Amino acid sequence: MYSIYNLIPKNTQIIIPTPIYINFLKAPKHLKRKVQRLPMVNDKGRLVIDFNKLSSIAKKNSWLMFVNPQNPGGTVYSKKEIKNLSRIIKEKNITVFSDELHCDLILQKNLKHTPLGSLKTIEKNVLAFYSASKTFNVPGLNCAFAVIPCDNLRKAFKQNAEGITDDANITGLIALSAAFKQGWKWRDDLITVSSTHLR
C-alpha cells in the first residue's frame, strides 16, 4: 500500500470514496499525502460512488482509490456504472488504484464483476490488484499481484516497492497457482454455503 501512495507526487489530489478499509486512509497520512474523501451514497440499498460529485471535485491528473466489489458495502458495480466511471477517468486523466481482491467472491448469481482495466480507453490509467487470499482463504502467503498495462506506471511501481513490499515466495506462488487452477469447485461450494447467510 505504501509503495502505491509513494508513486503519487506530493500535493496531488487523492480521492478516496468512504467508507473504506481504514488502512487506505492511514497510509497516505503517514506519507504526508493529501486525501479528499468522497462520501458514498445509498442507491436503493447499494453503497455507490456519486459519479456526479466525483466529476465535479476531480482535478486533472488526480488519483482515485476504487474498490470493486466494494468493501465494506459489498456493492458490485454494473458494466454501465464502470463505463460511466471510465468517462470521468478519461476526461480528467485520473490514475486509479483499483482494488479488485473480492472479485471472485460474489454471492449473488445475477451479479458479474467487470474489471476496470478491461476498458481499453482507460487501461493505461489503471493499476489493478488481485489476490487469492480473500476467496481461497490463503492470507499471509504474499500471493497478491498487480495488473499494470502502462509501462511507466509498472516500472515506477516496481521501483517504489523495492524494500517495502516483499517479493513473492515459493509457497505463495504454489498456493496462487493451485487456487486458480484447481480451486474453483471449492470456491463454488463456498459461495453456495455463504449465500444461505444472505438476508
Over which residues does each language-model region extend?
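Phosphate-binding glycine-rich loop
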Residues: M1-Q13
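A short helix->loop->beta-strand "cap" motif at the edges of active sites that frequently abuts
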Residues: T12, R33, E91-T95, E123-K124
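Active-site phosphate-binding strand-loop segment of PLP-dependent enzymes
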Residues: Q36, V41-L111
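Structural detector of well-ordered beta-strand residues that form the stable sheet scaffold
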Residues: I15, Q36, F97, L127-F129
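Short hydrophobic alpha-helical segments of the AMP-binding
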Residues: P28
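PLP-dependent aminotransferase class I/II
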Residues: N125-S195
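Conserved coil-to-alpha-helix start sites within the AMP-binding
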Residues: M1, I20-F24
